[in-house]
Regions:
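Extracytoplasmic loops and strand-loop junctions of Gram-negative outer membrane beta-barrel proteins
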Residues: 53-62, 158-165, 217
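Hydrophobic, lipid-facing positions within transmembrane beta-strands of outer-membrane proteins
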Residues: 70-76, 175-180
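Repeated loop/turn-to-beta-strand initiation elements of outer-membrane beta-barrel proteins
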Residues: 82-87, 187-188
Length: 217
């Protein structure tokens, strides 16, 4: 009764396991991982405090919808002498995306979604994922707050669990259109053609987008 109608449930992520001691002294989550968890894996919160991470620790994460619950737009125009500049903005708010396909919704699996949007460039950057210092030569890459967990081979059940780790705010504000108009008063040639006035107009669409979500559009 205290949960929203039609919601996505999942785990609360606590970042990534820092080292072997962090794994050893944390609640056991090998059941959902299907293997022993390792440093660099996503670490989940033991919500009910029983020392084991399982479905009983899942909580509501988001409304079960991939469309924004807030949509808005605004525009206007500025006039100066014979010039008129018009503009139109459109935006959304209160909308989440889970960047993993555990929900069978739009999103991507880390390291396996090819060239979807900016995914390849982001995951290829070693600074964005947990990497052992033995590989990188730099201890700072063992970052428990990295954007992506450690690189793994095959189906990684631990990293693809629905959780707050993959939850992203995908609100945006888009400059949808700019319209520039210049009015030509009727000169001698225009009058001879029977034209009282002439407007020259330039229109640009979908100019730019501001959003905290950078992986793909």
């Amino acid at each position: 009764a205290d949960k929203p109608y039609e919601y996505y449930a999942g785990y609360i992520a606590l970042g990534l396991f820092r080292d072997e001691d962090d794994v050893k002294f944390s609640p056991d989550q090998s059941g959902i991982a299907g293997r022993k968890v390792l440093p660099g894996d996503i670490k989940y919160k033991d919500v009910n405090g029983d020392g084991v991470i399982n479905s009983d620790d899942q909580v509501p994460l988001s409304y079960k919808a991939n469309y924004p619950r807030l949509m808005y737009g605004f525009g206007g125009e500025v006039r100066w002498k014979k010039l008129t500049l018009g503009f139109l903005f459109k935006g959304t708010g209160n909308v989440d995306n889970f960047c993993v396909d555990g929900y069978k919704a739009f999103g991507f699996l880390p390291f396996s979604s090819g060239e979807t949007g900016n995914t390849l460039a982001i995951t290829a950057n070693q600074a964005n994922r947990w990497t052992p210092r033995e590989i990188s030569g730099d201890a700072s890459t063992e970052n428990p707050n990295a954007m992506f967990p450690r690189l793994s081979y095959g189906n990684d059940h631990n990293s693809t669990q629905p959780s707050t780790f993959w939850k992203a705010n995908v609100r945006y504000l888009r400059l949808q259109e700019i319209n520039l108009n210049y009015n030509l008063s009727a000169g001698k040639i225009l009058k001879q053609l029977g034209v009282s006035s002439l407007d020259l107009q330039f229109v640009a669409s979908n100019i730019c987008v501001w959003s905290p979500f950078k992986h793909f559009d």
